[in-house]
Amino acid sequence: MPQLNPHPWFFIMLASWLTFSLIIQPKLLTFVTMNPPSNKPPIAPSTTPWTWPWT
């Protein structure tokens, strides 16, 4: 069964995991979120009822 032979796929999995954890992840963590969380309570918008044209 070729699925149990770790030679072809284990190195690819290990290389991609190391690439993600050592190169891509630190670059992504340096970004600052555009909308930081705030301590204000959420405000529900006040809506007006829809006026149907046939009523």
From Swiss-Prot:
Gene for this chain: MT-ATP8
Annotated GO CC locations: mitochondrial membrane; proton-transporting ATP synthase complex
InterPro entries assigned: ATP8_metazoa (IPR001421), ATPase_protein_8 (IPR050635)
PANTHER family: ATP SYNTHASE PROTEIN 8
Protein name: ATP synthase F(0) complex subunit 8
Transmembrane segment boundaries: 10-32
Function, as annotated: Subunit 8, of the mitochondrial membrane ATP synthase complex (F(1)F(0) ATP synthase or Complex V) that produces ATP from ADP in the presence of a proton gradient across the membrane which is generated by electron transport complexes of the respiratory chain. ATP synthase complex consist of a soluble F(1) head domain - the catalytic core - and a membrane F(1) domain - the membrane proton channel. These two domains are linked by a central stalk rotating inside the F(1) region and a stationary peripheral stalk.
Alphabetical UniProt keywords: ATP synthesis, CF(0), Hydrogen ion transport, Ion transport, Membrane, Mitochondrion, Transmembrane, Transmembrane helix, Transport
